[in-house]
Each structure stands twice: as C-alpha cells, then as structure tokens.
A protein has these predicted regions:
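C-terminal catalytic "cap/lid" subdomain
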Residues: 1-143
Length: 143
C-alpha cells in the first residue's frame, strides 16, 4: 500500500507526553482492507511529515534524522566486504551505482526512499547497523 497521509500532530502529541511511538508499516485501502506497506517507505513518509511540521509561530518543529538499520554497517561497494562502506550517496551517485550494479534488490527502494526524504525536508538519512548508532557511522544519504 501507498502512504497518503501521516498524522504528524498525533505523533507530536505522543512525543510531548514522553512516549516513543512505534509505527508499524500497516495501512488500509479505505474500504476495510489492511495493506502491508514497505517499512522503508513508512519510515520515510513519517520522517518527511515530522520534518515539515511547523510550530504555532510557523517555525519547523523538528530537525529530523532518519536512520535505516539493517545487518550491514552501511551501503557496501562490495557486498562481501563489510569494510567497503560507501560513506555518502547523492542522486548522481545513486544512479551511477544502480547502473553499474552496485546497488540492486532491496537496497534500491531503501535509497530511493532516503533520497525522497532528504529532498522533502529531512536533514539527513543514515543507513547502518544498530551497533553503529552511537557513532552515527554508516552511509549518509543526501545532498
């Protein structure tokens, strides 16, 4: 399913209450049928909604960093070498890496969602493994 709307205000109120929302990638078709939405898409759409939320005086409410966690330390130039992390990927890099086969399969929509997030207000996107979160290492996607 596609994401048509994210209620950033509801998420904002949960955050103000000290809660950490956990958002499942489930949507509905408006006719009572549940749909499984790509988790990367759901994360990207949520990040975009929060990045564009404004305070009462018109300022942006959040500086958003989106982190995609998976089993590798980042996007790899060589899938068999965990030390081959590509440090940064922008639009031009992405197309070149797709064309030469470095990026394929499930990594392609992940980076497409990451680029869309950055293009729509998200400060940066990091693709990494959970153990690297403290140091914020991995592949940074964006401009």
């Amino acid at each position: 399913g596609d994401v048509n709307h994210v209620d950033a205000t509801a998420i904002h109120h949960l955050l103000l209450a000290g809660l950490t929302p956990v958002i499942a990638p489930l949507t509905h078709d408006g006719q009572g049928h549940m749909l499984n939405t790509n988790a990367d898409t759901m994360a990207s759409e949520t990040a975009k909604a929060m990045a564009n939320m404004k305070t009462a005086n018109g300022e942006l409410a959040y500086d958003v960093t989106l982190v995609y966690c998976f089993e590798k330390p980042g996007v790899l130039a060589n899938p068999d070498d965990d030390n081959s992390v590509i440090p940064n990927i922008g639009h031009e890099d992405f197309q070149r890496l797709v064309d030469n086969g470095t990026i394929s399969g499930g990594m392609k929509p992940k980076i497409e969602n990451a680029l869309a997030a950055v293009d729509n207000g998200v400060g940066r996107v990091i693709i990494t493994q959970p153990t690297a979160l403290d140091g914020k290492t991995g592949t940074v996607v964006g401009r």
